Swiss-Prot record:
This is Profilin. GO terms for cellular component: cell cortex; cytoskeleton. InterPro entries: PFN, PFN_euk, PFN_sf, Profilin_CS. Belongs to the profilin family. Binds to actin and affects the structure of the cytoskeleton. At high concentrations, profilin prevents the polymerization of actin, whereas it enhances it at low concentrations. By binding to PIP2, it inhibits the formation of IP3 and DG. Keywords: Actin-binding, Allergen, Cytoplasm, Cytoskeleton. It comes from Litchi chinensis. Occurs in many kinds of cells as a complex with monomeric actin in a 1:1 ratio. Its main location: cytoplasm.
Length: 131
């Protein structure tokens, strides 16, 4: 299965009638493995800051999580495993796997819990596969 299939079929799929606004699978080095058509153009420094927060939990809290020029307020996640961010009625979930970052961006009417479930379910599966 291609990485694009994971994005299309597992991240951008419909959940309770809702779906993510955008999603991607990105290597720890910032290389894009696969992404939805409308995933924001991000800067390498934004991915580096996300990776730093996984190594040093809490480092993003003072500045916020930035992706594609959008700033998200960092909310409670799972140190070293999941970073969650909020911006207005939407937000972002980033799950770290052995080799990649699974990123889901949502907006209302999708809920934070639905986004977390979609992103973390795929992330947990990939971790189990050694990826």
């Amino acid at each position: 299965m291609s990485w694009q299939t994971y994005v299309d079929d597992h991240l951008m799929c419909e959940t309770d009638g809702q779906h993510l606004t955008a999603a991607a699978i990105i290597g720890h080095d910032g290389s894009v493995w696969a992404q939805s058509a409308n995933f924001p153009q991000f800067k390498p420094a934004e991915i580096a800051a996300i990776m730093k927060d996984f190594d040093e939990p809490g480092s993003l809290a003072p500045t916020g999580l930035h992706l594609g020029g959008t700033k998200y307020m960092v909310i409670q996640g799972e140190p070293g495993a999941v970073i969650r961010g909020k911006k207005g009625p939407g937000g972002i979930t980033v799950k770290k796997t052995t080799q990649a970052l699974i990123i889901g961006i949502y907006d209302e009417p999708m809920t934070p819990g639905q986004c977390n479930m979609v992103v973390e379910r795929l992330g947990d599966y990939l971790v189990d596969q050694g990826l």
